[in-house]
């Protein structure tokens, strides 16, 4: 499934990791992750090794894990209130949930992922990173955890176009909370295409397109949607996460 931020989340059974030198953006890492910068470096290494070996991260992504993945995801913290509960829907290899947890120790985060091999990686990663008191992992699709879990913020990256994502994510958001989705240049087009879905669901607030992180072109574009305080209505139901055919970068292999 083509996704707005253009980020490949998986690749078929990679066997070679590029040996290109990796430039660490030391100042940005220190600023964003603070005294957890060493844990962020450990997570980056997990993605570059086990993440690639298990097909969760494409080998060509390794040289840009810091900028395009860890920092890119951690910047979401700029639009999330202090002490919020967060569900990271379709977490994959932990993006954006794990970088967000590392950058924001005040958040309580639940990673929701339907596929077993990704779920296993996530459990191993949060243990390795010492995040078990802050981050939990649930295996399932959005409709599997609906009614069991909810949060003040639901995050998503490279999961689905907004037209589909609204129906999966907004029912997991508590009244007054937000959906925060990482999107790229397609954000405005996706918002326009999904307008009728929001109307069907009874959401009246207009989605916001926000830029977080540096203003030098390396920041992150996000779409933030307020859940509101009224009841949600069912929109035309899309197929659940995991049932939709994913693009080659996000296969459904176990």
From Swiss-Prot:
Biased composition (Low complexity): 9-21
Localisation: Cytoplasm
Pfam families named in the record: GidB (PF02527)
Primary location group: cytoplasm
A molecular function (GO) term: rRNA (guanine-N7-)-methyltransferase activity
Basic residues compositional bias, start-end: 244-254
GO cellular component: cytosol
Keyword list, A-Z: Cytoplasm, Methyltransferase, rRNA processing, S-adenosyl-L-methionine, Transferase
InterPro entries (alphabetical): rRNA_ssu_MeTfrase_G, SAM-dependent_MTases_sf
EC top class named in words: transferase
EC number: 2.1.1.-
Region (Disordered): 1-21, 230-254
Residues noted as binding S-adenosyl-L-methionine in the record, renumbered to the chain: 90, 95, 142-143, 157
UniProt record similarity statement: Belongs to the methyltransferase superfamily. RNA methyltransferase RsmG family.
UniProt xrefs under NCBIfam families: rsmG_gidB (TIGR00138)
PANTHER family assigned to the protein according to its UniProt record, in alphabetical order: S-ADENOSYL-L-METHIONINE-DEPENDENT METHYLTRANSFERASES SUPERFAMILY PROTEIN
Summary of the function given for this chain in its UniProt record: Specifically methylates the N7 position of guanine in position 518 of 16S rRNA.
Protein name per the record: Ribosomal RNA small subunit methyltransferase G
Phylogenetic lineage: Bacteria, Bacillati, Actinomycetota, Actinomycetes, Kineosporiales
């Amino acid at each position: 499934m083509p996704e707005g931020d253009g980020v490949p989340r998986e690749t078929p059974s990679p066997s070679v990791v590029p040996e290109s030198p990796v430039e660490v953006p030391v100042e940005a890492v220190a600023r964003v992750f603070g005294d957890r910068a060493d844990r962020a470096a450990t997570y980056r290494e997990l993605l570059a090794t086990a993440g690639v070996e298990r097909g969760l991260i494409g080998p060509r992504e390794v040289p840009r894990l810091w900028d395009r993945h860890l920092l890119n995801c951690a910047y979401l913290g700029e639009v999330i209130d202090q002490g919020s509960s967060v569900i990271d829907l379709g977490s994959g290899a932990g993006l954006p949930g794990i970088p967000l947890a590392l950058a924001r120790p005040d958040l309580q985060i639940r990673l929701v992922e339907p596929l077993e091999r990704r779920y296993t990686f996530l459990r191993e990663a949060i243990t390795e990173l010492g995040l078990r008191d802050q981050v939990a992992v649930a295996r399932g699709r959005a409709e599997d955890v609906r009614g069991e879990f909810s949060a003040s913020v639901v995050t998503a990256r490279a999961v689905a176009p907004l037209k589909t994502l609204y129906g999966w994510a907004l029912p997991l958001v508590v009244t007054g909370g937000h959906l925060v989705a990482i999107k790229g240049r397609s954000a405005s087009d996706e918002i326009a295409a999904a307008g009728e879905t929001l109307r069907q669901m009874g959401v009246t607030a207009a989605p916001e397109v926000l830029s977080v992180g540096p203003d030098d072109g390396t920041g992150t574009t996000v779409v933030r949607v307020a859940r509101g305080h009224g009841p949600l209505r069912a929109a035309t139901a899309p197929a659940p996460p995991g049932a939709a055919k994913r693009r080659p970068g996000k296969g459904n292999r176990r």
